UniProtKB/Swiss-Prot annotation:
Recorded GO MF terms: zinc ion binding
Organism: Bos taurus (Bovine)
GO CC list: core TFIIH complex portion of holo TFIIH complex; nucleus; transcription factor TFIIH core complex; transcription factor TFIIH holo complex
Quaternary assembly: Part of a TFIID-containing RNA polymerase II pre-initiation complex that is composed of TBP and at least GTF2A1, GTF2A2, GTF2E1, GTF2E2, GTF2F1, GTF2H2, GTF2H3, GTF2H4, GTF2H5, GTF2B, TCEA1, ERCC2, ERCC3, TAF1, TAF2, TAF3, TAF4, TAF5, TAF6, TAF7, TAF8, TAF9, TAF10, TAF11, TAF12 and TAF13. Component of the 7-subunit TFIIH core complex composed of XPB/ERCC3, XPD/ERCC2, GTF2H1, GTF2H2, GTF2H3, GTF2H4 and GTF2H5, which is active in NER.
Keyword hit for Membrane: no
Key word Transcription regulation present: yes
Record InterPro entries: TFIIH_Tfb4/GTF2H3, vWFA_dom_sf
Protein name: General transcription factor IIH subunit 3
A single BP term in Gene Ontology: nucleotide-excision repair
Cysteines paired by S-S bonds: none
Main location per the UniProt record: nucleus
Compartment annotation: Nucleus
Function: Component of the general transcription and DNA repair factor IIH (TFIIH) core complex, which is involved in general and transcription-coupled nucleotide excision repair (NER) of damaged DNA and, when complexed to CAK, in RNA transcription by RNA polymerase II. In NER, TFIIH acts by opening DNA around the lesion to allow the excision of the damaged oligonucleotide and its replacement by a new DNA fragment. In transcription, TFIIH has an essential role in transcription initiation.
Family under the similarity heading: Belongs to the TFB4 family.
Amino acid sequence: MVSDEDELNLLVIIVDTNPIWWGKQALKESQFTLSKCIDAVMVLGNSHLFMNRSNKLAVIASHIQESRFLYPGKNGRLGDFFGDPGNPSSEFTPSGSKDGKYELLTAANEVIAEEIKDLMTKSDIEGQHTETLLAGSLAKALCYIHRMNKEVKDNQEMKSRILVIKAAEDSALQYMNFMNVIFAAQKQNILIDACVLDSDSGLLQQACDITGGLYLKVPQMPSLLQYLLWVFLPDQDQRSQLILPPPVHVDYRAACFCHRNLIEIGYVCSVCLSIFCNFSPICTTCETAFKISLPPVLKAKKKKLKMSS
């Protein structure tokens, strides 16, 4: 029997920091900006750490060019994660608690603010790739969870879950990688939750349904913090005791590999399982040539000539 002190709860938050989407929000003179979203993420992270002193936190920014850890930052150490004082970092030293705040929260907030500032100031939007690298961010989160599991002591147990705060639209180009990540999370018993700010995400609906997580499209973006604390702060054990939003209808249509459109009926390659909306004699993914079975050719029957009497 594992006690509460020996049970670690790791929450990995993935924030969509697509500069194009957030730039459009700024042009609309919206009350909800990226800085307010990061503030809400900080409050959620602080609340998670306050729930139990053994709770752990990681924050990843999903950008158009990279996936970067906001917390722990570049100088984060595994010793920090599991409470080993170790040697203090020479490059980054948090200012400490000046108002009686828990020092871990102060350090986390400062690291997140510093990393997001560095990420956004160095963003280069030139080029055609303007989609959020969400599949890569989820893969990075799974790798981080796997690495943390190896550091857990023998008498401890760690439960992990991933929360995705999605802003930009889905990328059909990432469909295959996204589905691979979803099934990898399911195999490791890792929940994927989704908090969608704008249009619904069919990929995240599938991810939440397959892994047993919660999917929520925020009705009002300025109220993001309230929904984060109400729906996504409780872990999987506490959710059974709460009245949460009902599950949404999941769109399980697949995206074709030729036009990236969602289809109900299509053609599947028997070698690589790629899906196409139109028939092609050669698979464009694995270049397999299909043997087309033609209908059998029937020989024409010879007409019998009538004998003249």
